[in-house]
C-alpha cells in the first residue's frame, strides 16, 4: 500500500513519493508533504525551466536555480515563469 501524504501543492491526501527526491532539507520536505501527482506536475515544469532558461546540467548554478524553483513551485504562492515564456499552442 502506498504511503499517503496531505499534499501541500494539491490540497488533498494522495499517495506520497517512494523516496526523497533530493539529498537535502528540501528533498525531505517534498518527501513528507508532496504527492506523486504533484511531483509529475513538477517534472513538466522542470522541463520547461530547463528549456526556457537554457540551463546546462554541467553548470553548478543550475542545481541552485532548480532548487529555488522547486521550493517556489511546491511551497510558494505561485511558481514564477521565465520572463520570455510563451505557452505552447493549445492542441485542438
From Swiss-Prot:
* Lineage: superkingdom: Bacteria
UniProt keyword annotation of Membrane present: no
- Is Iron given among the entry's keywords? yes
Q: Which Cys pairs are S-S linked?
A: none
- Pfam families, per the entry: Iron_traffic
| SUPFAM superfamilies cross-referenced by the UniProt entry | YggX-like
Any single GO molecular-function term of the entry would be: iron ion binding
Query: Which PANTHER family is this protein grouped with?
Result: FE(2+)-TRAFFICKING PROTEIN-RELATED
Query: HAMAP family from the xrefs?
Result: Fe_traffic_YggX (MF_00686)
Family, similarity comment = Belongs to the Fe(2+)-trafficking protein family.
What protein am I looking at?
Probable Fe(2+)-trafficking protein
Origin species, per record, is Anaeromyxobacter dehalogenans (strain 2CP-C)
